[in-house]
Amino acid sequence: MIDRNSQFPEISLCEVLNRLRAGATVVTPNRRLALTLTRKFDQIYTRASVSAWHTADVLPFSAFLERIHSNALYSDQAHVVPQLLSIWQERLLWQSIIVSSDADHPLLQHSQAAELAQQAWELLHCWDLMQKFTHFPLSKDANHFLSWANSYCDITKNKRQIDAARLCDWITENYQCVFLEKSTSFIGYGFDFFTPQQARLLRKLHDDGRQVSVAYPESSDQIASAPCLKKKGHVEFATTDDEIYHAAVWSRTRLEENPQALIGIVAPNLTSVRNAIQRIFKSVMYPDACWISPNGNDIVPFNISLGLPLSSYPLIDAALLCLSLLQKEIPFNRASQFIHSPFWVGGESERIPRALLDAELRQLSEPAITLDQLVQLIKKIRGEATCPLLLQCFNELVALRDTKLPQSSGYAIFARVFTEALQRLGFPGERKLNSEEYQTVQKWQSILIEFASSGQNAASVSFYQALSHLKQIAQKTLFQPESLDVPIQILGVLEANHVIFDHLWVMGVSDEQWPLRPNPNPFIPVELQSQTQLPFVSPSQAFAYSKKLTQRWLNSADEVILSYPKNDDDGNALQASPLIHSVAKIPIHLATWQSQDELIAQSCKLESDSDHQAFALSEKTLEKPLKGGTAVIKDYAACPIRALIKHRLN
């Protein structure tokens, strides 16, 4: 690990902005920091009422490398430039190697093994461990990985291919041939450390006469001399939902006090609480949610940085459902979703007739249904009269399946067939798409391109394998539609690193979530990872890094609140993280805020009526001996309403 200050001079943020005006290139560890710095740069010109200016050259380090490779492809040295594999081309190659070697060492999850192998390959190259790894005492799993890695290296070498893990080394080795960047000043912004691979390229830039510096949102001196007037403290709440609710009310209160304030919400466990945050923040920011326009164009004042799997978006789910219909039977409830979907031709004009048709189909259909059975049922109940466009959609799918769907082919051919199937159905529908839906369609098209190109190292595959791979890409691709700049940013731990706020709330800082847990790669010996000081390998390294982040949070805003729930979702007791014991416990005073439901309840006069007796048994029932005995008591103890239905209502 290369220390942040060990090799390159550190400059102030003001100097970074000045050099950006002069055409410097700034690289960051992640996209969030690049966006933050770009916005800060743009604000200088907007406040000066400048109408146009050159875009700041700020981008993540990985994008910087890809740009160099892309420029080299269009230079007179293109003949020496290897093909850069995408993440999914890489993943599929690893998976095919693992599957082919699976006869002697069976694995249950090839895709997960491929993902871990890809991560191990990246770590070994980023941290210059490949040579040490090959001479290190290896476990059985590590030996399997070494065998896969040798095959992977041979295949990519023979096909003149390279991956993201080796791109930085390739640029450094071929620097004189391919480095076409015109900038003479390069700045690493917000890096806690440089990997040996990154440091080697930066030294190459420095040796070539280019100015290389590092910078941070606040310099070390500024952090050390931070004023003691900042409001800091930690708070505890009963549950996670209660914690999120108070964070939402606090955010709304601070926003009402100063609409220009930048408010940060950080959650170490953002993946697990994302849906709860979305729901609770929306209910607090928009208590009258029933009045929000149905087209989804309303602007909410918060943004959650963590995207959702692309497959979870309704538009993509509908597309994958359509393709699934081509192959096999599906549950009828999924077929019902297809019928109600607005993303096909007739989705709006036949909306009501399709709902009535679906109700009739439910009376006749089996729990699972095929495309042919669905067409037959619709014709049986004369659905072509009320929903001709829907029947046309199904007929188009049948025709395409029977005439153009290959049993086995390459990914590019299947991508073309998938696209045609959706086009025949009028995807993405009749109505005008809102911004989120439009961006989702654009992302769908990009993963189709990714899917089509991912089979360069693969032989022909079946329809089932092709569709499974497309679904895997959609499930693993996290997508967050772009939105306008909003004042409340909800971030994960690493994304919030080095970001400055006016107000900051860090939630979930319990002993279960903080500090971060070590996460070593299973294919690399733990001892080798510890010797190299890879991040998050040992508990001590994870603790030290988490401690540094905690201190950074406390200096990143004028008001900082750390919170945790006293109980988890299973009712287990939680304690405050040991990293926040030194932070004083404070009461939190929020303005009185009532939800829309509470306001409605207060505006009404509620009536109560005691109704605790069931109706009397009829005379006809009493003429016969009553049955039940102890079963009545047993059923009532288990579920009163179920007992009433069973024994009184028969």
Predicted stretch roles:
Residues 1-650:
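Polyanion-engaging groove/track-forming segments
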